[in-house]
From Swiss-Prot:
Function text: Produces ATP from ADP in the presence of a proton gradient across the membrane. The catalytic sites are hosted primarily by the beta subunits.
Compartments (UniProt record): Cell inner membrane
Matching InterPro entries: AAA+_ATPase, ATP-synt_VA_C, ATP_synth_F1_bsu, ATPase_a/bsu_AS, ATPase_alpha/beta_chains, ATPase_F1/V1/A1_a/bsu_N, ATPase_F1/V1/A1_a/bsu_N_sf, ATPase_F1/V1/A1_a/bsu_nucl-bd
Topology relative to the membrane: Peripheral membrane protein
Keyword Calcium (UniProt): no
SMART domains: AAA (SM00382)
HAMAP family documented for this protein: ATP_synth_beta_bact
Name of the protein: ATP synthase subunit beta
Organism field: Rhizobium meliloti (strain 1021)
């Protein structure tokens, strides 16, 4: 099976097309008339001097030819009267002082619309899947204003994911912003892939996936999985449902700091056309990290923990654009890496304020072998309200949380004195909590290759019914092992019968 090209390979493949690139740069020069020259290159930051009166605006895209490849620079600062400091969207190797740079007269603009479905683009909207050019003339600037308050929709509706722990304890809002928080290796990407599998496939509308500073291998795997599962057709075409925008780990910080905006711009276009869009981002932390990398090169004084002083502004400008309007909705699922498992780190802490639901993945739960390793006490959602989810759902979820909280409070006593020292009531609560913990695990479709167990999608009614029975003591007679890695409560009962038969 042919592998999707990495942006670097595609750049190398494009070298023969040098004359075409140079010609496009000339047309830009003719359009705006402003031509500058490179005066200094420091890593991803390039200084360009212009003639007096021709200074480009902040966030304008500048173009130059770097050994046959189109290199886009984005204006970040004005230095004095006729010089600008820019951030490069690709490698600056090979750039020389005195080289001509053309002002395009506007921000970076990327292709949008149905023609992007089934294709992989990079930060500047160039296709990187070796399937030919994008057949669309519709373009949209990656820097946009957030929708006005009067245009925003306030309707509250649940997005059912088929994942028990999410649907019961921290349900997602349709048209809301969802954050998946976790340290390294606790399952953020697997969970986001499962959500793509469960939600994007069942969802009739379009999806946009932005790969921000993550592994190229994972992006490649996702591309091929989407083709194999029928979500996309190779090279786009009729029937494709998802657009992919990648700026992976090997890209310079300029690309990683802007690729989330490119993906969001594609999603905004679908929303404004009246679609309900799913927007997946893996990983928002890399967006912040890339901003931090270029911030120091731009000469800004670092803030707390070495982050850029503009951290909250950068995050706010992007997150405020991800919203549901009266035309259509964007439901956003964002994986957020938590450095050293510290949720108080400025990068994840800044994200919390913008989210409707937070799913916190915990290393202590992953260590028990319970996957998805969602922390049932740390995860929150504004949707968990009896007015939205209904009285029964609300009551069951709160009972589950109080049982787990009680078990957590008793763990020190159990560790020191043992289970025998607990009261009968506490013993029952601990036994139920341990069953609930195991019943919150679930085999995933995307993890079938690792676990060998077929994936399970559980309806919300079945989830509520199962946990209601557990907290009310209806399944106290079943062994703990019966609840591990099953879907509905009926499967747990069946598993208990099998275990009893094997033991007999």
């Amino acid at each position: 099976m042919a592998k999707a090209a990495t942006p670097k390979e595609t750049a190398a493949a494009k070298k023969p097309a040098a004359p075409k690139k140079a010609a496009s740069a000339k047309t830009v020069v003719a359009a705006t008339g402003a031509v500058g020259r490179v005066t200094q290159v420091i890593g991803a930051v390039v200084d360009v001097a212009f003639e007096e009166g021709q200074l480009p605006q902040i966030l304008n895209a500048l173009e130059t030819d770097n050994n046959g490849n189109r290199l886009v620079l984005e204006v970040a600062q004005h230095l004095g009267e006729n010089s600008v400091r820019t951030i490069a969207m690709d490698s600056t190797e090979g750039l020389v002082r005195g080289q001509k740079v053309a002002d395009t007269g506007g921000p970076i603009a990327v292709p949008v619309g149905k023609e992007t479905l089934g294709r992989i683009m990079n930060v500047i909207g160039e296709p990187v899947d070796e399937a030919g050019p994008l057949k669309t003339s519709a373009r949209r600037a990656i820097h946009q204003e957030a929708p006005a308050y009067v245009d925003q929709s306030t309707e509250a509706q649940i997005l059912v994911t088929g994942i028990k722990v999410v649907d019961l304890l921290a349900p997602y809002a349709k048209g809301g912003k969802i954050g998946l928080f976790g340290g390294a290796g606790v399952g953020k990407t697997v969970l986001i892939m499962e959500l793509i599998n469960n939600v994007a496939k069942a969802h009739g509308g379009y999806s946009v996936f932005a790969g921000v500073g993550e592994r190229t291998r994972e992006g490649n795997d996702l591309y091929h999985e989407m083709i194999e599962s029928g979500v996309n057709k190779h090279g786009g075409g009729e029937g494709s449902k998802a657009a992919l925008v990648y700026g992976q780990m090997n890209e310079p910080p300029g690309a990683r700091a802007r690729v989330a905006l490119t993906g969001l711009t594609v999603a905004e276009q679908f929303r404004d056309e009246g679609q309900d869009v799913l927007f997946f981002v893996d990983n928002i932390f890399r967006f912040t990290q890339a901003g931090s990398e270029v911030s120091a090169l731009l000469g800004r004084i670092p803030s707390a923990v070495g982050y850029q002083p503009t951290l909250a502004t950068d995050m706010g400008q992007m997150q405020e654009r991800i919203t549901t309007t009266t035309k259509g909705s964007i439901t956003s699922v964002q994986a957020i890496y938590v450095p050293a498992d510290d949720l108080t780190d400025p990068a994840p802490a800044t994200s919390f304020a913008h989210l409707d639901a937070t799913t916190v993945l915990s290393r202590s739960i992953a260590e028990k072998g319970i996957y998805p390793a969602v922390d049932p006490l740390d995860s929150t959602s504004r949707m968990l309200d009896p007015m939205i989810v209904g009285e029964e759902h609300y009551e069951v979820s709160r009972k589950v949380q109080s049982t787990l909280q009680r078990y957590k409070a008793l763990q020190d006593i159990i560790a020191i004195l043992g289970m025998d020292e607990l009261s009968e009531e506490d013993k029952i609560a601990v036994a139920r909590a341990r069953k609930i913990e195991r019943f919150l695990s679930q085999p995933f479709f995307v993890a079938e290759v690792f676990t060998g167990s077929p994936g399970k999608l559980v309806a919300l009614e079945d989830t509520i019914k199962g946990f209601k029975g557990l907290v009310n003591g209806e399944y106290d007679h079943l062994p703990e092992a019966a609840f591990y890695m099953v879907g509905s409560i009926e499967e747990a009962v069946e598993k208990a019968k099998k275990l009893a038969a094997e033991a007999a």
